[in-house]
Amino acid sequence: MSATWFKGSCHCGAVKFEVRTAVTPATRCNCSLCRRRGALMSPMFAASELKIVEGEGALTCYQFNTRTARHYFCSHCGIYPFHQTRMNPACWRVNLGCLDGVDPYALDATVANGASLSVVEDA
C-alpha cells in the first residue's frame, strides 16, 4: 500500500495529528514496552510526514534502554499515538489504531525483533 494522508488522535482527542504513511506492512514489536502496550505500528516514515495539529503540550515522552527512541503518550488518556524509532531516529511510526478509518484488527502484522536491540537491560 502506498503512503497516504490520515487524520488521527488519541482516545480523549487532546492530541490530534495528520500523518502521511502506508498502513501495510503493519508491525508489532516484541520489546518490553511494545509487548505491554500492544500497539500495531505503521511502516516507518520521515519526521516531516507527521504534523501535530492540536495538543502538542499534552504529549509526554518516555525513553528507556539506550534512550534513543522517543515514545509519545497523551498525558490525559495514556494512549500512545506515535514514536521516533531507535533503529533510525530520523524515522517515526504511528499507532495504526489511532488513525481515522483504519481497522487495526483487519490487518496482518509481522513481528519486529525489538527485544534483540537491548544493550542495557532486558527488553
Describe the function of each predicted region.
Residues 1-9, 14-123:
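A short Gly-Trp-Pro
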